[in-house]
Amino acid sequence: EITTRLVGSEMCIRDSILPLKKNCSKKIAVIGPNADNIYNMLGDYTAPQTTASVVTALEGIKNKVDNEDVIYAKGCAIRDTSRIGIRDALNAAASADVVIMVMGGSSARDFSSEYEETGAAKVSANLISDMESGEGYDRATLNLMGLQLELIQEIKKLGKPIILVLIKGRPLLLEGIIQEVDAIIDAWYPGMQGGNALADVLFGDYNPGGRLSISIPRSVGQLPVYYNPKRTGNRNKYLEEVGVPRYCFGYGLSYTSFEYSDMEVTLNETADDCIVNIRVKIVNTGQKSGDEVVQLYICDDVSSYT
């Protein structure tokens, strides 16, 4: 229960159709390479797991609604560009009322590898691992790999509402994706109970209160991009795009709303230090319970240190 609650604090960065209603007899298509893969729910250097020890996104959704209302198709892999599953995914989406696409990346090690007597892994030219993140895995771009973006775009043409769940170990670019989907949940690696936690968020049993601990860039050309860059005489500007990230550090949405009021600031100054105490009143003004991350940003306008 503790694990499920912690993972439920994942970030919702777009939520125009969330939360979904339970027991409404609507067909749900669950599609994507991260929808039903236990190791893709976990981080790098994960030890071998039993199937029963990890709840995938698909299993979590099935635990929440009638199994007959859930249609699953993998669709594509993380990196492999084989098109063998595309048609099944399109058929599943066409027969559903709403589509949940579980995409992203993976740090999953391949525990099915065979090894030589020397200990070296046998490599097959026909096998392309899902792994695109973790130690020793660098990227030249931050786009969704393989056919993932193409699959999102093809399903968008069907006119069905799309909820995108991103399971991943690094920030990924959302340009070309935001306009194709109706909601985005940034789940990172949600862990062993991730499927149940994700279903709680999707169906409104838990209000996602997480906020981004990084900034998500608009392109790799913006890197490095973070919330507290050193102030210089010239601010970063680009000829091709704006200088601010797509989603800033601390960003996140909620199923409810909060109102701040009565802020009080007190100073306790000494010869060597200055302690600032800040108090603020927060009221939940919405219809759902929820958590709020109070964020305070400070900037030293004049400092003797750089």
Predicted features and spans:
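Single conserved hydrophobic/aromatic residue that forms the stacking wall/gate
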Residues: 1-13
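An anion/phosphate-binding loop that grips the pyrophosphate of nucleotide cofactors and donors
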Residues: 96
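Catalytic cores of nucleophile-dependent amide-cleaving enzymes
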Residues: 133-137, 141-192
